[in-house]
Amino acid sequence: MSKLDNYIEQIAVVVILYKEEFQTVVSCLNNIKNFKIIIIDNANDKNLKQKLIPHYNFYKYILNKENIGFASAAYQGINECVTDYAFFLTADCLINEENIFLLLEAKKKYKDCYLTSPTFFDQQGNLTYNGGLLPENGDKSTPLNLEGDSCVETVITTAVLFNIDEIKKIGSIDKNFFIYFMDDELCRRIKQNKKSVIQVYNSKAKHAHGNLKIDNRLKRIFFRNYHFTFDELYYYFKNNTHNKILNETRKKIFKYFIKIFINLILLRFEKSIYYFSKTLAYLKFIRKTGKF
């Protein structure tokens, strides 16, 4: 068995989908078709599956009946893997075999490294954000201008490679998150266990930081603000640094209730949905954690 064939046998690629265009998925899969591919589709898109099945030899193709969130789908994907390593990938990220192999080589090269991730570029070849600071430590929007592999506090789980047993050892993915802050919490846990997260300089990927794939504007406003508010509160709760943000949210809740009804009366539905979503997320956090 050649070195490349050996690498392919060690890695399963977990692709998490939600309302993806056929051509977007095809472009992604064409780069990774030699790996064991596990599809987790949170949109239960049977038509997409029927179109793809004849062209690819999937290891598993799972249709979730409802959108369980990126975190739960990632957890699900890990448990479906039979390889030593898993590579998480979203359909809007293009990376070829060679660049995935570079992630594996870096993972094996650096002692105590638990997670490797490529350097992202947009369609025009401009450097875009991946690795950086945890939310509590600074801004996350500025891309790192690397000159070599770099140990970072956190990366985006759009494209990450890890050893399955190692990630399970520290508790795997926390399914209480939906989509936001999941990557930060995992990376923070890795750091707490005195392990490292590496952004690999020579491993390149094209990634267009995407928008929510929800057509209805009111649903999109609710989805973003409900899940972001809960996930943010839960992230800081897990870090035991939630008191400040919780107090700030608590002070606003009564005003939110008033604004919900005022904006309904004034037919400003977007504003009403915004305040409703944040209020509901706060109440969910209280039920989940018992923290007021």
Listing of model-derived features with the role each one plays in the protein:
Residues V15-K33:
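Short, well-formed alpha-helical segments that are part of the catalytic scaffolds
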Residues D41-Q50:
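A conserved acidic beta->alpha catalytic loop
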Residues N64-C81:
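Glycine-rich, basic loop-to-helix element that forms the pyrophosphate-binding segment
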Residues A86:
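Short aromatic/hydrophobic "clamp" motif used to bind/position activated sugar donors
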Residues E98-Y129:
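Conserved donor NDP-sugar-binding/catalytic core segment of glycosyltransferases
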Residues L134-E153:
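Short, flexible, basic/aromatic active-site loop/helix in glycosyltransferases
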Residues T154-F162, E166-G171, N176-K204:
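A short, conserved alpha-helix in the catalytic core of glycosyltransferases
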Residues F223-D231, T241-F292:
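Non-catalytic, C-terminal membrane-associated alpha-helical segments of glycosyltransferases
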